[in-house]
Every structure is written in C-alpha cells, then in structure tokens.
C-alpha cells in the first residue's frame, strides 16, 4: 500500500470506530432510559403509569402507559403503547393507540395480557415519533417531536398539529402537549412551554 492508501484506510477505520462507539453509546443510553421509565407518577389531578410489556414484533423496549385524569368529578382514562428503538444513531419513541382499549384495562396489573397483542390491535401515530437525548448535566432524558409532521386528534375535537415534549429522571416524569392549526395558531394546551410534572410514587 502507498502512504496515501494507508491514510485512506486509517481514516476509514477511525470512521467505523467512531460509528461503532456512537451506536454502543446510544444502546447504553436506551437501556438506561428503559430502566428509568417504569413506575407510577402522580401530579395535579392526574396519574401516569408505565409498565414494560413483551411485544418483540414492535421492539425490545415496549411499554403500556395509562393516564387517569379527574374531569368533572370522574376519572378519564387514556391508554397508549410506546416503543423505543435506535434509528440513525438516535433514540426514537414511537406511539400507538389501542383499537379496543377496554380489552387492556387490566394491563397495569396484568402485563402478561399483552403477550396476545398483535399488529391489528395497534394504530401507529405516524409522524409523531419523539427523539430522546440524554442531558448529562441535569441527569435527565429529554424527548421532543417534530410538530409539522405530527397530526393527532386533540381532546374533544378534530385533527391538529401536536407539539409534544417530555422529560424523565430518577424522580419524576414531565410532559407537555400543545395543539396548533396549520397557520401556527395554538388551539389547546398550556400557553407557555412549561411541562406538567408528575412525581414518582
């Protein structure tokens, strides 16, 4: 090999090593995030719970999440499946709605129910994927979606563009969901960028 060829080969090896190192780091961060998430969190008038489930056709890191919120003196329950994976060297969260929520209402107490989960039971919230990064300085993970790609049903109304952000630490879970029309006017959700915080129980 000529000196130039050796230099090219060395650069290629260094590039591959850097890529491998990044991939390994993301896998380690995903494992840490998946270990932090399970649990029950309580905030003002609401509770959010995450339980890991076995659904390998989606991902190795899949959770059933259920939120109970007091509205008009009664509890309103919402359910989702969320899955985490590595894509393009980034931690990506995909979210799914359940076709028959009543079938899974005992899912928190009996996560083995989800061993019968199939693709037909799920509806992917396409375009609403969240990218997660680790904030080492504040010992937290931070997630956000791309609003312009995420059209989702807002409570009590039709489709709108959803701006979603979330944080997870060893002590709490926080999130914000704000809805906008095509012109960028806010339709629902908090007016500022503050997150609703839920303490781990």
Please describe what each predicted stretch is.
Residues 22-47, 53-201:
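Calycin-type beta-barrel ligand-binding domains and close structural analogs
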């Amino acid at each position: 090999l000529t000196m130039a060829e050796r230099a090219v080969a060395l650069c290629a090896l260094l590039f591959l090593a850097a890529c491998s190192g990044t991939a390994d780091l993301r896998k380690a961060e995903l494992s840490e995030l998946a270990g932090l998430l399970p649990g029950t969190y309580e905030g003002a008038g609401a509770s959010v719970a995450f339980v890991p489930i076995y659904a390998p056709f989606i991902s190795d890191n899949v959770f059933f999440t259920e939120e109970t919120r007091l509205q008009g003196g009664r509890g309103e329950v919402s359910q989702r499946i969320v899955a985490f994976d590595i894509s393009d060297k980034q931690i990506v969260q995909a979210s799914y709605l359940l076709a028959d929520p009543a079938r899974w209402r005992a899912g928190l107490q009996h996560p083995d129910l989800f061993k019968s989960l199939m693709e037909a039971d799920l509806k992917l919230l396409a375009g609403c994927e969240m990218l997660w990064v680790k904030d080492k300085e504040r010992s937290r993970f931070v997630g956000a979606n791309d609003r312009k790609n995420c059209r989702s049903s807002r409570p009590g109304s039709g489709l709108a563009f959803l701006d979603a952000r979330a944080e997870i630490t060893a002590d709490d879970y926080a999130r914000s969901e704000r809805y906008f029309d095509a012109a960028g006017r806010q339709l629902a959700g908090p007016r500022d960028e503050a997150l609703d915080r839920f303490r781990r129980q």
